[in-house]
Amino acid sequence: MTKTAIAVFSDPKSGGDEALGRLFNALILTLELKEKSQEVDLIFQGAGTRWPAEIVKAAHPANALYMAVADRIAGVCGGCADIFCAREGAEASGLDLIRNRDVPGTSGVIDLSRYLEEGWRLVAL
């Protein structure tokens, strides 16, 4: 069975359709893999840590899709959320802030290399 980690880096503050498109593609791929009973983790990384505060809103166009894959969301990069001023929104979304890798100048980040070491595919959007 394949294992896929999908990291959302796109920034909702960019104001463009591309960022929203990348989010939708990440959510859709997560849903497709979930429906095929494959192991999949969705991660919010970098400026993408700003998304959780937005997509938990019922009026957001990606909310229904987000809710459909909520059980496959591994969490939000804690150090990234700090750097991109997204910690409060990420915490309010109820998602876990993950800081399992010490990186100088941060409060800790998600260790993406763990996924590669364990044979996961990594998709960055």
Residue ranges and their predicted role:
Residues 3-6, 40-41, 73-75, 96, ...:
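Structural motif
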Residues 4-24, 50-54:
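Short, glycine-rich nucleotide/cofactor-binding loops
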Residues 21-35:
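Histidine-anchored nucleotide/phosphate-binding helix
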Residues 42, 48-58:
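N-terminal beta-loop-helix "entrance" segment that forms/cooperates
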Residues 57-87, 92-96, 101:
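A glycine-rich helix N-cap at a beta->alpha junction
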Residues 109-124:
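C-terminal binding/interaction regions
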